[in-house]
């Protein structure tokens, strides 16, 4: 079966993802299980899309972006180079907070520019 989206050979898309027609996933990126990515999206190189993330139609995700569980982006969202989402308040390495993940909603047409952190 041929996909109607493009994934570079160095990237991974886990089972259980829904990827829209015309979407492109470039070098060294990882789209984890349960993600939904809309039509005509562009996922740059070295991007991590954690489990169950939702990206609307025509989203542009630039290089080196980390999108963590709980993030939902509307249509036409632009995520600039090296921006990151933080899905817990006050993260610490010695304390597991997986039960404290926060949902983050980014509305239609929003811009998160270069090196922005959204908590």
Set out the residue ranges of the language-model regions.
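Flexible, glycine/small-residue-enriched loop-and-beta-strand segment within the central core
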Residues: 2-4, 9, 17, 24-119
